[in-house]
Amino acid sequence: MKEVTANKFQRVEQTDIGEEWNGTSLTYWKSVRIAFFQNKVAIITATILLIIIAMAIIYPTVSKYSYLQQDYKIRNLKPSMLHFFGTDEGGRDIFTGVWQAARISLLLGIIIALINLTIGMIYGGICSYYGGLTDDVLMRIIEILANIPLLVIVVQVNLILGPSIFTFVIAMTISGWCNIASLIRGQFIQQKEQEYILAAKALGASTSRIVSKHLMRNIISIAIVTITLEIPSIILLESMLSFIGFGSAMLSWGKMFYTASFAIHFYPYQVLMPAFVISITIICFNILGDALRDAFNPHEVVLKK
């Protein structure tokens, strides 16, 4: 047997063997942004929504027609180049009215969604963090409120306070936050068992700090998706309630439906034109919400290199 000596081996340098990483690391929010902008449908949807919001803000101000002024000489005109959506029973330009009503409908949707989200996050956070008897009692309250029909709440609040925007906001927020609170509670329960929460408790962090600095930050993505999907639901509910006479007192899309419903058999365009804008708005919000949900979920998003 030949003897193996050191001179039969050659030293191999290690400098060129190791793998080198020349790429840039992605933070969570950067990966979300990349995933969202890769979704072409989401970009188109967001652009349409921005146009709708811009039209609601700008067009009623620059339009040569005022929806508040009636002109019976041009009543019930069909859509034309002068009046894109035609005119109504009072001779008012429907195209101008749609964008003026959009101000109230969109504003109500955003305000009510923000209020419901705020109440739901606080309530759901308290339920999940303390647990036990506190959680049981608070969840029973949610079950009671959530099972009261919305129409009953709206009618009772209108009878007590009278029809107004303030009344409508109160009616929509009495039980509107319940589903959000249940969703946030479930997310909080998942998060509070994580190691970083246990570490914060071990370091002596207060309850308020743990909730605000740790738990809230980790469900912000859920909050963004929730509010995006909540807005179209509120707009649709406002339109439905205004159509049956229980909506806000000011001009809104639902109010336009209610006014045009008396002439729908003779002038269907007076309902169809506002309905088209409302449908586009609601569809865009729902598509945007789904796109945001996909972008915020790192387990389902596949980033292109």
Regions inferred by a protein language model and the residue ranges of each:
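Residue-level recognition of transmembrane alpha-helices
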Residues: 48-49, 97, 139, 143, ...
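Amphipathic cytosolic juxtamembrane alpha-helices at the membrane-cytosol interface
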Residues: 92-107, 131-139, 189, 193, ...
